[in-house]
Amino acid sequence: MPELPEVETTIRGLSEVLMGEKIIDVKVRRASLRRPIPSDIQERLIGSTIISLSRRAKYGIIVNDRDDALIFHLGMSGRWKINPENFEKHDHFVLQTKNNFIVSLYDPRRFGSLDLVKKNQLLEWSYFRNIGPEPLTGNFNPEYLQKKLFSSSAPIKKILLDQKVVAGIGNIYACEALHQAKIHPQRPSKNLNFDEITSLVFSIKNILQKAIAEGGSTLKDYARPNGELGYFSTKFKVYGKEGEQCECGHTIERYTLGGRSTFLCSSCQK
C-alpha cells in the first residue's frame, strides 16, 4: 500500500502539471472504487481552477477556486498517470486541463477512493478528524511520542502504524525506521526510554525524507505520475529481505505482527 512518501511524491508530481490549471473536462470511466466516486464530481470540478495540492497522512488533496477539495487515497495499487498514451480498463477517473494536461487515476484492485468535500470541512472529515500529527513536522517530537507510549504495553511497531498516533506511516517505513533506531518491533512501547524514543523519532523522519527524495518505493504497482519508479526500495535494509544478511552479518528474520509481515534483525534490534 502506498504510504506517506509515495503520496507525497504523487502530489509533487501532479503539482507540476495541475497547479493553477483550469479544468475543462472530467470523465468517470468506472465509478466502482472502495467507495463510489461522487455523482456530482463533474459539475463541481469542470470550469474551476486548481489552487492547491497537498497531502494529509496517506491522502492527497486537490483544492479548486470553488473551495471544493478532491481527496484521493491510492489504496493497494492505485497511481496517477500524466498524459497517458491510451486509457486502460482500470483508469477510473480522468481530468483534463485547459493547457491539455490529462491525468488519470489508475487502480486495478479498486481499494482506492475519491471523495469531494468543502475545504472548510476538511478538518472534520471523518478520515481526518482523529488523525495524528504529520511525522515530518515539529509536532511529532520525542516529548509527544513519549506521552503516547507512556502507558501502552502494545508492541512499538503497532503503535507506529496507528494513524491516531502519527499520520502516514505504514508497514514498510515502520520496519525500516525501527531497524535504523535499533529497536525490536515487539518491544512493549512503555519500556522505551527517552533516548530510544528520541532515536526513533529521528529515524522515522530520516527514513521518510530519504524515501521522498528517492520518489518512494516501488514494490509491485506503484509508480510516480510521470511513470518513473520509486527507488527507495533499492535502499531497504530489512523490509522484504527475509533470509538475507543484515549489515551486521546476522540473518534478517520475518514474522507476523498484527496480521502484517514484520522484518527485523534480532541482533541489531533489541
Swiss-Prot record:
Keywords: DNA damage, DNA repair, DNA-binding, Glycosidase, Hydrolase, Lyase, Metal-binding, Multifunctional enzyme, Zinc, Zinc-finger
Active-site residues from the entry: 2 (schiff-base intermediate with dna), 3 (proton donor), 58 (proton donor), 260 (proton donor)
GO biological process, one term: base-excision repair
Sites where the protein binds DNA: 90, 109
Pfam families for this protein: Fapy_DNA_glyco, H2TH, zf-FPG_IleRS
Entries under InterPro entries matching the protein: DNA_glyclase/AP_lyase_DNA-bd (IPR015886), DNA_glyclase_Znf_dom_DNA_BS (IPR015887), Formamido-pyr_DNA_Glyclase (IPR020629), FPG_cat (IPR012319), MutM-like_N-ter (IPR035937), Ribosomal_uS13-like_H2TH (IPR010979), Znf_DNA_glyclase/AP_lyase (IPR000214), Znf_FPG/IleRS (IPR010663)
Catalytic activity: Hydrolysis of DNA containing ring-opened 7-methylguanine residues, releasing 2,6-diamino-4-hydroxy-5-(N-methyl)formamidopyrimidine; 2'-deoxyribonucleotide-(2'-deoxyribose 5'-phosphate)-2'-deoxyribonucleotide-DNA = a 3'-end 2'-deoxyribonucleotide-(2,3-dehydro-2,3-deoxyribose 5'-phosphate)-DNA + a 5'-end 5'-phospho-2'-deoxyribonucleoside-DNA + H(+)
Cofactor, free-text remark: Binds 1 zinc ion per subunit.
FPG-type zinc finger segments: 237-270
GO function terms (MF aspect): 8-oxo-7,8-dihydroguanine DNA N-glycosylase activity; class I DNA-(apurinic or apyrimidinic site) endonuclease activity; damaged DNA binding; zinc ion binding
Superkingdom in the source lineage: Bacteria
Cofactors (names): Zn(2+)
Entry EC number(s): 3.2.2.23, 4.2.99.18
Function: Involved in base excision repair of DNA damaged by oxidation or by mutagenic agents. Acts as a DNA glycosylase that recognizes and removes damaged bases. Has a preference for oxidized purines, such as 7,8-dihydro-8-oxoguanine (8-oxoG). Has AP (apurinic/apyrimidinic) lyase activity and introduces nicks in the DNA strand. Cleaves the DNA backbone by beta-delta elimination to generate a single-strand break at the site of the removed base with both 3'- and 5'-phosphates.
Similarity annotation: Belongs to the FPG family.
Complexes and interactors: Monomer.
Protein name: Formamidopyrimidine-DNA glycosylase
Species of origin: Zymomonas mobilis subsp. mobilis (strain ATCC 31821 / ZM4 / CP4)
Name of the gene: mutM
